[in-house]
Regions:
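Catalytic phosphate/metal-binding cores of nucleic-acid and nucleotide-processing enzymes, i.e., regions
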Residues: 1, 40, 50-67, 75, ...
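N-terminal capping segment at the start of a domain
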Residues: 1-35, 82, 222-232
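Short, solvent-exposed beta-strand-terminating loops
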Residues: 5, 196-219
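Extracytoplasmic/secreted proteins, especially bacterial periplasmic and envelope-associated proteins
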Residues: 10-14, 33-36, 40, 128, ...
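A non-catalytic alpha/beta surface segment that caps or lines the substrate-entry region
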Residues: 16-72
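Glycine/charged-rich beta-loop-alpha catalytic/anionic-binding loops adjacent to active sites
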Residues: 73-88
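Acidic/histidine-rich catalytic neighborhood of metal-dependent amide-processing enzymes
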Residues: 85-188
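His/Asp/Glu-rich mid-to-C-terminal helical/loop segments that flank catalytic regions of hydrolases
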Residues: 106, 208-255
């Protein structure tokens, strides 16, 4: 599969350099200045012509930076930029999701995209975002789709076990497998009454079975077990799959 457009390639190719950026540690090591990964995102958005607002805030003694790519839609997509292991590429968790969210914003400019901070250390960014949504900072928001581990799998994906308008929409469009997932940025959103779900593409198993089955076969979730390790490397994701996921799954959901 070839990348459809040169414009898409410019965004997708940035994943290699993004994976090479090293933070000092988790978001608890942040300072008042954006982390190296956050600064990379800001610079990338400037380079490709997307306006990126830095929402700096503190929670206790800790510093966080949510990155806001504002749109006119009532729909929102989020992905977290913080990490656990500073020695890892953090390719699938969650560098690919950040790049996919930016590509989606480029293709569908009206969508609201928020790149959150602090997911790995207690969901500080999404907790702040949930309060901002409730306070009307973005106008009425119908639902929030959370991108997690979106580096490989393309149009084969699963969603979390949340209920609501967003979940019904995804089921009507694709009827994917549904699985209860560990806590993510969806947790504070759902706790604050905001319609949300998490989406995670996964490649197909080449042999054997799993507990996630779609029309194409059984999904392979082995990538879940290398999150936060130095095995979560750039070579284990696919920019072709990333583009397929954005153009054939995310675009229909958000439009």
């Amino acid at each position: 599969m070839k990348i459809v457009s040169q414009e898409n390639r410019e965004v997708l190719d940035s994943i290699r350099d993004f994976c090479a950026v090293r933070n000092h540690g988790t978001a608890l090591e942040n300072t008042e200045e954006p982390s190296p990964r956050a600064q990379f995102i800001i610079d990338l958005c400037n380079k490709i012509g997307l306006e990126c607002e830095v929402d700096y805030f503190r929670s206790g003694i800790y510093h966080y930076h949510n990155l806001i790519l504002r749109g006119s839609s009532t729909r929102m997509v989020i992905a977290h930029h913080d990490i656990v292991n500073p020695n890892s590429d953090n390719a699938n968790d969650n560098s690919a999701s950040v790049i996919n969210a930016i590509l989606l914003k480029k293709i569908v400019p009206e969508i609201n995209v928020i790149i959150t901070d602090g997911e790995e250390v207690g969901f500080a960014g999404s907790n702040r975002l949930s309060q901002q949504i409730k306070n009307g900072l973005f106008g009425p928001i119908e639902w929030v789709l959370n991108l997690e581990l979106t580096g490989k799998g393309g149009k084969n994906f699963m969603i979390g076990g949340y209920t609501g308008v967003l979940t019904d929409r995804i089921k009507d469009l694709f009827n994917p497998p549904i699985k209860n997932t560990p806590a993510s940025d969806c947790f504070p959103l759902s706790a604050n009454g905001i319609d949300t779900n998490v989406i995670n593409p996964l490649p197909l198993l080449t042999e054997g079975q799993s507990d996630m089955l779609n029309e194409n076969g059984y999904l392979d979730n082995s990538s879940w077990y290398i999150c936060h390790t130095e095995m979560d490397t750039f070579d284990k994701i696919s920019i072709e799959d990333m583009e397929e996921f954005v153009t054939e799954v995310l675009v229909p959901i958000v439009k």
